């Protein structure tokens, strides 16, 4: 059975392979080409272009692009039903005398399409309707020859393994979430249980950066490409009266990753605001600056930005006496790299450098590219907007589909990198489960460390002491 190539090979620098579409489909009604590039088409024609026949198999770039973006216009199970129908029609329309021969020719192509779908978008098949259609079509193929039976079995086993791994991962996330508590609550009830800080758990900033990279890559790995589209699907564009967002919004892994970013920011702020002594707070700031710098060197831009965000939170940034004891030159450089001006120009330049390094990498470490995720989401949001708008003639704007697919396929390449660093369970456990302060608790800790400087801060301090500590 043909193996699918890596995602990095799917798109050239211009966004897609420009010589893929010189096929019999060029004259197909409902598709519009320019210089052999597919620019637009009716939804029905695009679906037909996805389905193989005896003389044709769609390019993998097209398969990925259409399976990714078509969900802006229809449910995946609706697309699967249409694909099944067209495959059966192709078989029926063939000469009855050569029916078995035709099936023998088309079966491996249909099986390859199903394999690509189940490998790249396995989460689609958590829907029972999808799985039912898949099994029906797979049964048709398997009833032919022994070879196909084995390949169908292999495809189904691989899919079931992926879905089982996802369920297991979600259970772990749910367990972590259910046991998470506010640090102030724990301090008031069991103060002896939080006597450690991050430096006592891991005194080496380089090791901490590596463990953060473990968490980032694990969480990235479970994000399905379709989540980038489904996150922005509000309702079915073909049915203006009925919202289907609740059914289609399957973006748990993407949301869990965004929550991780927020947790890391609050963890950094908590660790800085906790120490009673000024020199210990200054030491903690310098420690996180070194962690952030190593994250930058690794190519872990998401942890880097989360650390900078935590250090820039008001409860931390207002600690002027603490910051006065910190050597900030390294921090200034990192802030400059992640400066949001000119649409994050400096960061985007650094990201391109890391992506280029990844392409020519000689080691797993050089392959690591972990983008600043919130910005990636923002970029993809605007691409989704363009994809969802049909052209005046009712055609789907496939040129926009290409742009979206290129961005997501690059992400797919990055998320498949294996983390080369040794895991430290003790450090990972601390990073994922140690209680952190809420925003109010951070302000209270900050005011307790360095007193209020004006009437507004004094009033807030009194209010927080009263509400959080029951003191006046």
From Swiss-Prot:
Guanine nucleotide exchange factor (GEF) with specificity for RAP2A, it doesn't seems to activate other Ras family proteins (in vitro). Residues 34-164 form the N-terminal Ras-GEF domain. SUPFAM superfamilies: Ras GEF (SSF48366). GO terms for cellular component: early endosome; late endosome; midbody; plasma membrane. It comes from Pongo abelii. InterPro entries: Ras-like_GEF, Ras-like_Gua-exchang_fac_N, Ras_G-nucl-exch_fac_CS, Ras_GEF_dom_sf, RASGEF_cat_dom, RASGEF_cat_dom_sf. Gene3D superfamilies: Ras guanine-nucleotide exchange factors catalytic domain, Son of sevenless (SoS) protein Chain: S domain 1. This is Ras-GEF domain-containing family member 1B.
